Amino acid sequence: MNLSYLVACGLLVTFLSDKMDAQPLTPAQQKSLRSLLGEELAEFLESGENENRLDDVRSRMRLLRDLRVDTRARGMWARLLNDQPASRRHKSGSKKGGSTSRSGCFGHKMDRIGTISGMGC
């Protein structure tokens, strides 16, 4: 039973791949295309310039994608190595009472809560 499905799928793929070939437009098809889409759009679609433009756009998109990936990778390595400039403000001082002084608890400058006393503020 599985063999019959395999043969059927193989035949289906063969028939579909045969029908999917690109073929140039015949003069009758070109005429109907012009009548449906208009003269300007039909000429644009038929011309080879759109292939050059498409290649140009693809190359620009590829360059932008590579640049974006490159900057992401640099940012990741900078975070890992901690080389990026410190854009955050230092979080020091007491947050209680709105004090703006840089001294920590009890007049001592502390990096973390409880580094001196072991209990915090």
UniProtKB/Swiss-Prot annotation:
Propeptide section residues: 23-96
Region (Disordered): 80-109
Main location: secreted
GO biological process: blood vessel diameter maintenance; cGMP biosynthetic process; receptor guanylyl cyclase signaling pathway
Protein's cellular compartments: Secreted
GO molecular function: hormone activity; hormone receptor binding
Keywords (A to Z) from UniProt: Cleavage on pair of basic residues, Disulfide bond, Hormone, Secreted, Signal, Vasoactive
Tissues/organs with expression: Brain, spinal cord, spleen, heart and fin, and to a lower extent in gill and ovary.
Disulfide bonds: C105-C121
InterPro entries for this protein: Natr_peptide, Natr_peptide_CS, Natriuretic_peptide_brain
UniProt signal peptide: 1-22
Cellular component, GO annotation: extracellular region
Functional description taken from the UniProt entry: Exhibits natriuretic and vasodepressant activity. Has cGMP-stimulating activity. May help to regulate body fluid homeostasis in a variety of aquatic environments.
Family as reported in the entry's similarity comment: Belongs to the natriuretic peptide family.
Protein name: C-type natriuretic peptide 4
UniProt source species: Oryzias latipes
Designated gene of the protein: cnp-4
